[in-house]
Amino acid sequence: MRPIDIRPDKLAQEMLDYTSKLGQGMENLLNADAIDTGVSPKEAVYSEDKLVLYRYDTPAGVTPQKTPLLIVYALVNRPYMTDIQEDRSTIKGLLATGQDVYLIDWGYPDQADSALTLDDYINGYIDSCVDYLCETHEVDQVNILGICQGGAFSLMYASLHPDKVKNLVTMVTPVDFKTPGNLLSAWVQNVDIDLAVDTMGNIPGELLNWTFLSLKPFSLTGQKYVNMVDMLDDPDKVKNFLRMEKWIFDSPDQAGETFRQFTKDFYQKNGFINGGVKLGGKEIDLKNVDCPVLNIYALQDHLVPPDASKALNPWSAARTYTELAFPGGHIGIYVSGKAQKEVTPAIGKWLNERS
């Protein structure tokens, strides 16, 4: 076996470089300003309980489409992921294509919200926002962009209110919750959801956050902090890293009854595929989703595997069904440079062709 060639001079230089980088990194961390997220100008135009509906300012020189676009985000994280910084903003990209963008901010549920159900979210909050947009813009239908769990909510809404949805875009949205390789679904199959909700009321956001991180423990809880050392001497990269950390750990609690129903009816019983889920006395049926659909999924998504999203195709009755595969992960589809160049313009183009 060939002996390892250790040169003291090179080793000493590497140690000096490493120490210098750590020192510069500590200075950058100490000097980092407050980490701004949600950078695009917006105005709160409607509120109900914890919910706030925001309208984003149309850029100068851009004429907005007549049909407004409502973004329905997931409950489990904060929606500023879609507008996390100036050069990594799904919102900004959509505005540039002429979309009149509105976004639902669900806020931070507390114990007063523990009895909220899926019916409250779908037939209550989302429907109220859609009615507000229809009245404000004097239209009969809106475009909807649903993100992750918000995509599942949007499918439920389009199933129950097909007359109010002109076009539907779903991003990294679970449809078949029991596809092979779905680690999150496999993990939750044997969890006693009733016991968890009955014991805690609302489900702590921190608990869910650590559950998601545990699906890729090495890369998400260890390796990224080791890799961070290599960027500490770059102030811009430090701020980018801190923005992502802020978002990852900004996890609202989940309204207990909604969590119970969504987890049991969809993760455990696969409600979109097997049926049997009723809201407001009407059954959720994807065959009622007859508007044009653009279904976008990420090829390296560990939370919503591609097959879980692609299952929408055979189950919906969309007049036009289009798929877009993105070569990245669950978060990269919003924040990567490639996504800014490919995904957001594709959404805008698809919507504009059907305006």
From Swiss-Prot:
<dbReference type="InterPro" id="IPR000073">
    <property type="entry name" value="AB_hydrolase_1"/>
</dbReference>
<comment type="function">
    <text>Polymerizes D(-)-3-hydroxybutyryl-CoA to create PHB which consists of thousands of hydroxybutyrate molecules linked end to end. PHB serves as an intracellular energy reserve material when cells grow under conditions of nutrient limitation.</text>
</comment>
<feature type="domain" description="AB hydrolase-1">
    <location>
        <begin position="68"/>
        <end position="333"/>
    </location>
</feature>
<dbReference type="InterPro" id="IPR010125">
    <property type="entry name" value="PHA_synth_III_C"/>
</dbReference>
<dbReference type="InterPro" id="IPR051321">
    <property type="entry name" value="PHA/PHB_synthase"/>
</dbReference>
<dbReference type="Pfam" id="PF00561">
    <property type="entry name" value="Abhydrolase_1"/>
</dbReference>
<keyword id="KW-0012">Acyltransferase</keyword>
<comment type="pathway">
    <text>Biopolymer metabolism; poly-(R)-3-hydroxybutanoate biosynthesis.</text>
</comment>
<dbReference type="InterPro" id="IPR029058">
    <property type="entry name" value="AB_hydrolase_fold"/>
</dbReference>
<keyword id="KW-0583">PHB biosynthesis</keyword>
<comment type="similarity">
    <text>Belongs to the PHA/PHB synthase family. Type III PhaC subfamily.</text>
</comment>
<keyword id="KW-0808">Transferase</keyword>
<comment type="subunit">
    <text>Forms a heterodimer with PhaE, which may multimerize in the presence of 3-hydroxybutyryl-CoA.</text>
</comment>
<keyword id="KW-0963">Cytoplasm</keyword>
<protein>
    <recommendedName>
        <fullName>Poly(3-hydroxyalkanoate) polymerase subunit PhaC</fullName>
        <ecNumber>2.3.1.-</ecNumber>
    </recommendedName>
</protein>
<dbReference type="GO" id="GO:0016746">
    <property type="term" value="F:acyltransferase activity"/>
</dbReference>
<feature type="active site">
    <location>
        <position position="148"/>
    </location>
</feature>
<dbReference type="GO" id="GO:0042619">
    <property type="term" value="P:poly-hydroxybutyrate biosynthetic process"/>
</dbReference>
<dbReference type="GO" id="GO:0005737">
    <property type="term" value="C:cytoplasm"/>
</dbReference>
